[in-house]
Amino acid sequence: MVYILSEQLIESTPEYVLKKDIPAVFFITEEELPYILEKLKISFEREYKIDDVYFCKAESLQDCIFGTLYIPKLLDILGSRFRLMFFINARHIVIVDNSGFALRILNRIKRRKIHQGGTKAKFMYNFMTEFMATDSELLERYEHRLMNLE
């Protein structure tokens, strides 16, 4: 799926976005990654598998920022986690996800936010704050439990 970055995210096609050179966010699976990176002219020389993601990081490469996100599932904090990779270049964001988690976050942004992503920075801010939204509530519950144990 591809969405044009504007105040309201607009669904589009990769062909249209690439032809018009419009800033956009791509939600893809690992299988689609080589094709999309080639089309966006993002050179990524290492072989990276989404199953190899075990922590959150971001690194600056020659023509993009590459990052990984390793996000705990709220109902199973110590168990399995969502694994994402992202690439950000001058015009586009590519989010790689095999689980559907990123699309669920996108749908929440579209439902809850008025200013959904006029810029790459605004979109990434919305994306990250959306999956961290309940973290403070969860931490507060743990804090209360710890205080009760004292």
Each predicted region: which residue ranges?
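Helix-boundary and N-terminal cytosolic regulatory elements
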Residues: 1-114, 138-140
